Amino acid sequence: MPGVKVKETESFELALKKFKKQCEKAGILSEVRKREHYEKPSIKRKKKAIAARKRAMKKQRKMMD
C-alpha cells in the first residue's frame, strides 16, 4: 500500500506527486479500471486471445525486419 511521509518543508504538490508515482508503480489505477465493471469470463478469454495474437504478429513483424 503506497504511503508518503511529508516533511514540514515539503509542499503538498510534491507529496501528491510522490503518492501518485507510488500508486502507478503499485498498479493500483490499472487494477481499479479493470475492476470498474464486471467482465464475463468468456470476454476475458477473448481479450486474452486477441492480445496474444497481437503480440505474435508484432513479434513476427519484428523478425521480418
UniProtKB/Swiss-Prot annotation:
GO terms for biological process: translation. Pfam families: Ribosomal_S21. GO terms for molecular function: structural constituent of ribosome. The keyword Ion transport does not apply. One of its GO terms (cellular component) is ribonucleoprotein complex. It comes from the Bacteria. Keywords: Ribonucleoprotein, Ribosomal protein. Gene3D superfamilies: Ribosomal protein S8 (1.20.5.1150). PANTHER family: MITOCHONDRIAL 28S RIBOSOMAL PROTEIN S21, SMALL RIBOSOMAL SUBUNIT PROTEIN BS21. NCBIfam families: S21p (TIGR00030). Belongs to the bacterial ribosomal protein bS21 family. This is Small ribosomal subunit protein bS21B. The gene is rpsU2.
